[in-house]
Amino acid sequence: MKTSTFAPFAKPLYVMVKPVGAVCNLACDYCYYLEKANLYKDNLKHVMSDELLEKFIDEYINSQTMPQVLFTWHGGETLMRPLSFYKKAMELQKKYARGRTIDNCIQTNGTMLTDEWCEFFRENNWLVGVSIDGPQEFHDEYRKNKMGKPSFVKVMQGINLLKKHGVEWNAMAVINDFNADYPLDFYRFFKEIGCQYIQFAPIVERILSHEDGRHLASLAENKAGTLADFSITPEQWGNFLCALFDEWVKEDVGKYYVQIFDSTLANWMGEQPGICTMAKTCGHAGVMEFNGDVYSCDHFVFPEYKLGNIYSKTLVEMMHSERQHNFGNMKYQSLPTQCKECEFLFACNGECPKNRFSQTAEGEPGLNYLCKGHYQFFKHVAPYMDFMKNELMNQRPPANIMEALKNGDLKIEY
């Protein structure tokens, strides 16, 4: 359903939790979060206290307007907190549930998974997201531990444990300069390891040194900055998505779920895309650090985007503040004319504001760095999306497109 006005309490309040802040057992070259530890140099331990855990769980559940409540545990590396921490969290969730249904999902690099962890996740129906960048030669390029040792073998051991215990899991893969030219190797790898739900995230960062030791630029810092070497190019991103889509649409619709394809079809239907990057507005997904500091978004953990602390302001006050509403609405309002006149604005919505540091041909600021790649993708998939939209509108499965392509019933002209 389309909404023309911003209705803050129509959506569940959502805040991801960082129980260990930026602490991690890996040191991935492209990680945007490791350096956030520099924001908390005065804290000896970047560990969430039991007191804060209880305060957050009580307030988070109490602030919900829906019967289902989703907790998302994020890092850093979440499993660097002991299992007892998450057992304590579940006890507190039950204590404060007040009749609501509680769900949990957790993101991990997979290297610390054990039988005990997996038994806990299975018994309590936790969804586990695993960060893995495809086959070993691609994954190990950037995802190494602090000693410079590769992590792929340990990640796969963790995935095999999840499968052994029947834990529901999905994969999140970062697409970078090194792996972007091999989309089919990537995609087929995930199918081979039995992963049905896949998220591909393009990495784009600018280097800009700060006095506190941080080296990544925020959107608010309009200084030029230097594009990080690991960043994907717009052309690589467009080619990656198109090649991957061509195989998926012929063989795997309804069998394997690629987040950006699902979200694109949702936007084609005029429905909510399910991810903030492709929505018209954002700002509904905040993040809370280990000490209770709340920020506008996981990709905006910078001093200028800090909303406050849970000890001095409530989650509702912060997440439904005028400041946060403006942050979310600016996703659309700050778009340059080129975007607002684009035929694919409805599908793209300017993607993530953090990547909007380029200029249009007319010199207007605010263009997404990946614009060319997104446009290439949407132009390429448009006839397929039109077909699948028509199937859904007529209460038929979009997977019918595979048979139509096989039989030559769907002629694609560009």
Describe these PLM feature segments:
Residues 1-14, 26-30, 59, 411-414:
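Flexible, acidic/Gly-rich N-terminal and inter-domain linker regions that tether
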Residues 9-51:
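Canonical Radical SAM [4Fe-4S] cluster-binding loop centered on the CxxxCxxC motif
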Residues 15-18, 70-76, 103-108, 258-260:
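Extended hydrophobic secondary-structure segments that form protein cores and membrane-embedded regions
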Residues 20-27, 77-80, 282, 339-341, ...:
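Cysteine-centered iron-sulfur cluster-binding motifs in ferredoxin-type domains/subunits
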Residues 57-72, 81-219:
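Radical SAM/AdoMet-radical enzyme domain recognition
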Residues 145-153, 160, 164-277, 281, ...:
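Radical SAM enzyme [4Fe-4S]-AdoMet core and its adjacent flexible, acidic
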Residues 301-414:
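Flexible mid-to-C-terminal extensions adjoining Fe-S/redox cofactors in radical SAM and related proteins
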